[in-house]
Amino acid sequence: MKKIIIAIVLLSATYTKTNACSWSSEDGSFYNLFNQQLISDKSLLPFFLTYDETFYSANGLNDDATATQEIDYNILEWKKYFNNQLNEQELHYFVYQSSVADLSKISTSKSLKGINDTLKKQIYLTDKGIEAINYLLFAKKCEPFATSSEESDDENWYYGSIRKKMTKPEFMSTAKDGNLLYAATKDTDIKLRIAYQLVRLSHYGGFNDDAIRYFSTYVVPLKQKTLLYYYALEQKAGALFNQKKFAEAGNAFAEVFHNTTDRKIPCYASFRISNQMSFDKAILLCKTPNEKAALYVLRGFNKFSNGLSEMKNIYAVAPNSAYLELMACRALLQMEHTAFQIPNQYNDKNTFPLMNVAGKTYLQKAILFTQTLLKENKTKRIDFWQTYLAHLYLLNGEYAKAQATAQKINSTDKDIIAQKDKTEFCAYIGSLKTIDAAAEQKIYQRYLNQKEASNETGFVYEILGHNYILQNNLAKAFLCHNNFSGLYGSLNIAIINDLIDFVGKKNKSDFEQKLISDKIASDNALAELYDLKGTHYFKKDDLENALIWYKKVAENLAFLKQRSYDYDKDAYIETDGIFNGYSNISAGIFSSKVQTYFDNTVEQAFSDNTYTSFDFIRKSLNKQQLVEAMIQLKKMAAGKDEQAAKANFLLGNFYYNTSHWGYYRNFFYYEPGNYYLSYLYGYNTTPNTIKKTYNYNEGAGLITSNNPQKAYDFFIKAESISSNNELKAKSVFQASKCELDLFFSKGDNDYFGYGDDYKLLYSTSTRPMFKRLKDNYSQTAYYKEIQSNCNYFKYYLQFRL
């Protein structure tokens, strides 16, 4: 358990503010700059590379993707069958929703009376219509055995639907009906549909020999390689797989994969060839180069496959295949995933782009392959492959070659043109050694005057952010990745000073104005920076310097809101927290109570009203007024009278309340609330240091320290000066809280490090203030309040350790 706490403390040193239960995206962990949608066959979209999902979706997974609507290819086949006389909505009802009763009425009476209005179409009374209806009646009879429609009734932990189990007599009876219908049907399209139902029925019923026989005797003789042919072939492939004829099954799945759009994913999911011998046999069974290419691409999707090797295999048999383009894009994105990883800002060995030795070797082989492909001139889409090569050069850090190759591309494809421009400009950015005004203007003209940021813009900011750090332009480096909230954890004075100069600069360039407006939403940017600088000094207890900067801030400045997710409304909502960033701070920050909880309201959290003895402490303060009050309290605390004792007590309360275990622990970290701040949990009594950063893409870090000794000293001084036993009792009890924090801060005594010896938490050795409280102040009213509300003290009195 002790190691867990140590890990938390170490993690806090590289803190970045995130939602506690936020979803982490691997697709979002790198800059994807190459558009996979450049491939010629868009039906392959599900097989674009994605790390977050099993299959790629254009609906929101990729900035370059356009939303696609699912097409029902079966309905399109029905539309052709009825010579486009019925629309897709009418056909959808006819095929999927019509009742057996209505269809039977039409078939037997040859009339449309007494049926659903949607079915009242004269075309259903034609010979084609009647044969279609008779087929649907048979299909609906087969449906329970072929689709998942029944709830599982076994005792396993499975709650999904299952297919109805089929007995041999049920199969024989249903197949006989299909045989008779097949023989009686004249239209070959409907005969093919009946044959498909019989192949599927046999396959799902476990009668694999019958499935293969039906395909050979009912499907093949029709000589119709339409969609239903491939639907039937897929069922035959499943039967072959069940018979452990893996090569034959793989070959059939590859043929269906190549010739259909809607069955690509199921065929990929069903494709199982685990050894080279079976794969070689499947290749020999292929009738066309494209079928061979489909086999290679199906194998290439597996994680164990080498994408470049499969590219070479596909190129050898079908150099113009879209599968080659697909495998090339997948391989390139894998290389981007390695090279363009968003850097860890605290990694001393970081470089960007980043490529390990194995990745570099693979990239150079890909470059050589693409150069050879272009030289041999076997492919028609020269513009695609030139664009691809230019991007490989970009990945390899050969920026001049990337720009030169991109400039040679001549294309009428707007997507190719957009990609080559993107690659060329990213190469230009990568080649920059310093960022000057001319470079900034060029960047502004290309990106920053656009309304929506792209992944490319993120890449550009990555390069800029690091170069700006090297140029010691900290403000611009910081704003490449952050708004002011990136400073809340560290209050980095160097960045704050540079930001004050930058934001206050006159005659800003277009680039500089855009950088500020994109990252800083505030209308009072300078005021917020002055507040940050003041708080930097306040956190160091340098009150005089803090006051200088707070005097530049409007007294009612407020910029923090509590942000939470409303699951009912599916939206984030903002509410007021206990701290708005600058103003409306309760005088309770100087107060105390025996037992305070983080989820208390301010009114619930504190009960002591000693602070009301000081007229200069307002009920509600801003930071300037708070610092002014503390300066006065510190002056008074140097005295020897009762007011001096009270001043020491209030100062102790302030330092305790703003410590990591106090109600206002959020105060110096700009959190609107004090709840769920696990990143603050730390026992270090001196501030941690932050390593030299590669960039600021995770903010400026987190600097924490917990100093209960300061509060303790003020409480002890208050007790020593005061002549009021009630105030003495309060001071001693508050000091006992500090004792516990000090106990935890010593080496092996962190929260889980005291060996689960809970008695240490209330023993005299750990809490000597408990003994002082018992010995000296047991007659006070506050002592009785402590007895009633503090369990630690109750245990101390009980065990007298």
List PLM regions with ranges.
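Sec-dependent N-terminal signal peptides
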Residues: 4-13
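Bacterial Sec-dependent signal peptides at the C-terminal "C-region" and cleavage site
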Residues: 13-21
